[in-house]
Swiss-Prot record:
Pathway: Aromatic compound metabolism; beta-ketoadipate pathway; 3-carboxy-cis,cis-muconate from 3,4-dihydroxybenzoate: step 1/1. The gene is pcaH. It comes from Pseudomonas putida (Arthrobacter siderocapsulatus). Signal peptide: none annotated. It comes from the Bacteria. GO terms for molecular function: ferric iron binding; protocatechuate 3,4-dioxygenase activity. Belongs to the intradiol ring-cleavage dioxygenase family. SUPFAM superfamilies: Aromatic compound dioxygenase. Its EC number is 1.13.11.3. Its cofactor is Fe(3+). This is Protocatechuate 3,4-dioxygenase beta chain. Binds Fe(3+) ion per subunit. It is an enzyme of class 1 (oxidoreductase). Fe cation binds at residues 109, 148, 161, 163. Plays an essential role in the utilization of numerous aromatic and hydroaromatic compounds via the beta-ketoadipate pathway.
Length: 239
C-alpha cells in the first residue's frame, strides 16, 4: 500500500494490542467477544468522518483550572498535558477534536455513580476539549489526578490517569485511550495495563515529564503524543 494513500488503513499488529479477554481484569470476562471477529471492508463510511472545526469553543474549554471555576481554583498539583496527534504514517492530524476527562486530585470523578469517599472539588469539573492546531498539537492545563480503588480485586487501585477521546479525520480513526504518568509505582500493578503484553505499547501510554513546556512558578508539564491507527497506534482503551 503506497504511503501517500491516506484513505485506507494499514493492518493493525495484533501482537501490539491486548487480548480482549484477560481474566485478571474482571470486566473483560463479560465484555470480550466469544465468536471470531468479522473483518468489514473499508468504505466511505469508515474513511470519512465529521469535521469539528465549526464548533464554538469556550475560552477555557482546554483549561480545567478555570472551566469549572466557582469562585476559587481547584486543589492539587497543577500540570500541563500536551502533545501531538499523528496518523499511521507519522503525519500530523490538524483540526481534530481532542476530549479529555479525569478524576480530581483525590481520585474522584464528578459523576453520580462515583461513590469513592474522597470529596468532590467544587472548582473542578474534570472535563476539557480542544482542536489540534495546523501541526497536530494540543494542550490542556489541569490538575494531576489521584489514584483510586476499584472493584476488580480485594485491593486493586487504578494508577493516576487521564482519559482521552480523539476523533481523527474519519470514523475508523476514532480513539479512546488513557494517559499514565512517568514514575507511578501503580502502573505495573494495574490489571488493565498488564493486559498489554508489549512493553513498548505500555510505554506509549506513559506521559513523560517535559520541563521545556513547563510554566515557571505555575505548572509542570507532561508530553503525551498520540498515534491514530496503523501498526504502532496508541492502545485503544480496554475498559
Amino acid at each position: 500500500m503506497p504511503a501517500q494513500d491516506n484513505s485506507r488503513f494499514v493492518i493493525r499488529d495484533r501482537n501490539w494490542h491486548p487480548k480482549a479477554l484477560t481474566p485478571d481484569y474482571k470486566t473483560s470476562i463479560a465484555r470480550s467477544p466469544r465468536q471470531a471477529l468479522v473483518s468489514i471492508p473499508q468504505s466511505i463510511s469508515e474513511t470519512t468522518g465529521p469535521n469539528f472545526s465549526h464548533l464554538g469553543f469556550g475560552a477555557h474549554d482546554h483549561d480545567l483550572l478555570l472551566n469549572f471555576n466557582n469562585g476559587g481554583l481547584p486543589i492539587g498539583e497543577r500540570i500541563i498535558v500536551a502533545g501531538r496527534v499523528v496518523d499511521q504514517y507519522g503525519k500530523p492530524v490538524p483540526n481534530t477534536l481532542v476530549e479529555m476527562w479525569q478524576a480530581n486530585a483525590g481520585g474522584r470523578y464528578r459523576h453520580k455513580n462515583d461513590r469513592y469517599l474522597a470529596p468532590l472539588d467544587p472548582n473542578f469539573g474534570g472535563v476539557g476539549r480542544c482542536l489540534t492546531d495546523s501541526d497536530g498539537y494540543y494542550s490542556f492545563r489541569t490538575i494531576k489526578p489521584g489514584p483510586y480503588p476499584w472493584r476488580n480485586g480485594p485491593n486493586d487501585w487504578r494508577p493516576a490517569h487521564i482519559h482521552f477521546g480523539i476523533s481523527g479525520p474519519s470514523i475508523a480513526t476514532k480513539l479512546i485511550t488513557q494517559l499514565y504518568f512517568e514514575g507511578d509505582p501503580l502502573i505495573p500493578m494495574c490489571p488493565i495495563v498488564k493486559s498489554i503484553a508489549n512493553p513498548e505499547a505500555v510505554q506509549q501510554l506513559i506521559a513523560k515529564l517535559d520541563m521545556n513546556n513547563a510554566n515557571p512558578m505555575d505548572c509542570l508539564a507532561y508530553r503525551f503524543d498520540i498515534v491514530l491507527r496503523g501498526q504502532r497506534k496508541t492502545h485503544f482503551e480496554n475498559c
